[in-house]
Amino acid sequence: MHYPKVYDVIVIGGGHAGTEAALAAARMGRQTLLLTHNIETLGQMSCNPAIGGIGKSHLVREIDALGGAMALAADKGGIQFRILNSRKGAAVRATRAQADRVRYKAAIRETLENQANLDIFQQAADDLIVEGDTVKGVVTQMGIRFDAKTVVLTTGTFLGGVIHVGLEKSSGGRAGDPPSIALAQRLRELKLPVGRLKTGTPPRIDARSVDFSVMTTQPGDFPSPVMSFMGDVSMHPEQVNCYITHTNEKTHDIIRGGLDRSPMYTGVIEGVGPRYCPSIEDKIHRFSDKDSHQVFLEPEGLDTHELYPNGISTSLPFDVQFELVRSIRGMENAHILRPGYAIEYDYFNPQALKFTLETKAINGLYFAGQINGTTGYEEAGAQGLLAGLNAARRAWEQEEWTPKRDQAYMGVLVDDLITLGTKEPYRMFTSRAEYRLMLREDNADQRLTTIGRELGLVDDVRWAAYCEKMEAVERETSRLQHVWAAPNNPMGKKFVEMTGADLSKECSAIDLLKRPNINFGQIAELTGSEVSQQVGEQIEIAVKYEGYINRQHEDVAQLKRLEETKIPADFDYDVVSGLSREITQKLKTVRPETLAQASRIPGVTPAAVQLVMITIRKNNMTKKTA
């Protein structure tokens, strides 16, 4: 059947990338179709039941600032919230939400089903319709043809997915779900640069068989933080504890004894696993000097006894999994509900993409999520939103948009993938960003919500809330600049009494806030401030880090000069005099779009960038005089 409706955007896959892509396109007013192999698994958390963490929560806040669904779903489904790095600087603080899988998934599905301009259809996609070098639509498993101006592919681990438990293997995109074999084959036919990666998950444990009394209790923070700028603590369901235990020498001996049947150590798995989320067998091998490793027992939800033992991801045979689990303190009688496994899947070299996440080879075809070599819900969601908004803009022949490295962690993510490529699952960290003082969790809305409004991603309710917040920040900052404390006035005396600090001359409340040991809470008490915690936090960070932030703005201004120098798409690097063969080859492989991107390619020297710039200028002069 040839489906009668022509869509602006078709999104294949209903995971974290797919849902954000579909919602973004639909919010922008495009007729959008979300194809999923199973409506019941929309927004499913395939691995750990958590959203956020170091570097990752920054992405979640950016998705949220652009009107995305992930942060609000985390607030509606979060059963424990914590601020990580709370004693460190504002740039590296991160929010983490332990999520109830069922509640999180329900929140995502509710958002999808109530989104205007969005149709959902349950069918696996088997084929892409490509005419010349342009995608025209999709053919499903049943042979239904859907036509579209653009297609976003967010297939997760389903492309050619193979599940491994010990030396046993089976086809699967996730435990209990079939892989996408036909689509994987079709993509290989299109001559896109394909590789194999792997990821894994731990065995799930029945909480009733665990002795928590011998473990360390890990409660959430109180008062509980929220993930979304539109979130509220009243959205949170019941809050629960997590628990910490450790592996031991006996555990490690059991694992070593099973390595001869490990698919990772017998060459059965060829795909590279995530460096920063290694399996337990990988930890034992790589960190052989360590006597133990932490295991975090995380509840999967409020209405289930299932626990996620974070830290023992494994693909060892089940009999070895059984022994290693029962060797851990507090888990001597543990009952395994589901075995751990590894999954190997196809991904495509992200260097074959444009910055909009459109493939260079096929016009109108966009990739997002694990298909691009990333790992994590947050990385997937960020790419999905960007791919969805750019597919939507292309569908209406509008100029596409991707944030720069100084605008968002999303920009860092995309630039890293396309400039550097990846041969292992890519995970976001704050350390990957040069301008992390400017790219904080708390100011994601300041950086992106105005842009999101212009793009059509941000609705009236969010926009009104953002404007109200920014007006409050402005008003309160101005007020504090005109409230004065002096050694002999009541406010000055109260300040000295409250803080024990010296006050030798008259200071504004803003000047007092600049002091290292003074926080906004103290200033609020001193001056009778009634603004929200969010507004107070923004003011405090802006005041305390003003000098550092100004220096970063100067660095960004220098970088922008390189960003503004575009490299023509057909630029011939072979004619650049003085470039080494190695650097020429690297530039021809990546084909950077700007001099700034060229400067970030490993091995490309500042001198080489200078030579390219000189050649571009010469070419431009020649064109002008011709």
From Swiss-Prot:
Keywords per UniProt: Cytoplasm, FAD, Flavoprotein, NAD, tRNA processing
Keyword Acetylation assigned: no
Lineage, highest ranks first: Bacteria, Pseudomonadati, Pseudomonadota, Gammaproteobacteria, Moraxellales
Classification via PANTHER family: GLUCOSE INHIBITED DIVISION PROTEIN A, PROTEIN MTO1 HOMOLOG, MITOCHONDRIAL
Protein function: NAD-binding protein involved in the addition of a carboxymethylaminomethyl (cmnm) group at the wobble position (U34) of certain tRNAs, forming tRNA-cmnm(5)s(2)U34.
Record-listed NAD(+) binding positions: 273-287
A GO term for molecular function: flavin adenine dinucleotide binding
Keyword tRNA processing: yes
Protein name: tRNA uridine 5-carboxymethylaminomethyl modification enzyme MnmG
Pfam families according to UniProt: GIDA, GIDA_C_1st, SAM_GIDA_C
Binding site for FAD: G13, G14, G15, H16, A17, G18
Similarity field: Belongs to the MnmG family.
Quaternary context: Homodimer. Heterotetramer of two MnmE and two MnmG subunits.
InterPro entries: FAD/NAD-bd_sf (IPR036188), GIDA_C_N (IPR049312), MnmG (IPR004416), MnmG-rel (IPR002218), MnmG-rel_CS (IPR020595), MnmG_C (IPR026904), MnmG_C_subdom (IPR047001), MnmG_C_subdom_sf (IPR044920)
Source organism superkingdom: Bacteria
Cofactor(s) needed for function: FAD
GO cellular component, one term: cytosol
Native organism: Acinetobacter baumannii (strain AYE)
Biological process annotations from GO: tRNA methylation; tRNA wobble uridine modification
NCBIfam families reported in the protein's UniProt record: mnmG_gidA
Localization (cell): Cytoplasm
